[in-house]
């Protein structure tokens, strides 16, 4: 498990910092009892040089679902429905984006009038985290070589399947 006692590597400096295994167990309990409302990532894709200079964070976008699914759903801590809420519906609700009057368009539900921001996931695909295959600039990942279950196969943003061209347009 990733915690402060086992990982003193400069590349793994994060905010908030890694905690003890006791804290990690308490966090699992908080997922289980409903205390935790959201799972998200700030996706801080730093280069190796950035990390060597002490930049906190690491790439999380390409592993967040699979790691959460493996560590929380596959182990029975929470259901897949709860994970979906933690990563989609709950953040939208907390940010006020879950209604059709939202100035940015409604999100977080599969309903008419809501933006079609979706992912297609194979919940059974087993794979090994290999940061060299990440599309992001940051190849630093504490989950390197971790065996995970659950693979995001495709993403749609506002109803359009995500492609490199769409990503370039969104960034502008």
Label every model-predicted segment.
Residues 56, 112-171:
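C-terminal cap of metal-dependent C-N hydrolases
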Residues 12-22, 59, 141-147:
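A short acidic, glycine-rich active-site loop
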Residues 20-29, 69-74, 148-155:
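Short C-terminal domain-edge/linker segments immediately following a structured domain
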Residues 23-27, 105-108, 141:
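A generic local structural motif
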Residues 11, 32-33, 37-39, 44-119:
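His/Asp/Glu-enriched, well-ordered alpha-helical/loop segment
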Residues 1-39:
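Histidine/acidic residue-rich metal-binding segments in metalloenzymes
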Residues 5-13, 49-52, 135-139:
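Short glycine/proline- and charge-enriched loop/turn segments
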Residues 1-2, 20, 47, 79, ...:
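Helix N-cap and loop-to-helix transition residues
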């Amino acid at each position: 498990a990733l915690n402060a006692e086992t990982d003193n590597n400069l590349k793994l400096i994060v905010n908030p910092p890694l905690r003890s295994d006791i804290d990690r167990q308490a966090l699992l309990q908080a997922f289980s009892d409903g205390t935790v409302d959201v799972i998200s990532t700030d996706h801080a894709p730093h280069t190796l040089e950035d990390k060597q200079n002490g930049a906190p964070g690491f790439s999380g976008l390409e592993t967040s679902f699979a790691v959460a699914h493996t560590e929380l759903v596959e182990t029975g801590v929470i259901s897949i429905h709860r994970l979906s809420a933690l990563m989609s519906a709950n953040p939208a609700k907390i940010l006020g984006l879950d209604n059709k009057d939202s100035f940015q368009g409604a999100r977080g539900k599969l309903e008419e009038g809501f933006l079609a921001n979706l992912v297609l996931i194979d919940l059974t695909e087993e794979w090994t985290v290999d940061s060299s295959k990440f599309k992001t600039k940051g190849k630093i990942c504490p989950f390197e070589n971790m065996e995970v279950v659950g693979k995001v196969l495709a993403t749609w943003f506002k109803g359009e399947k995500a492609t490199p061209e769409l990503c370039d347009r969104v960034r502008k």
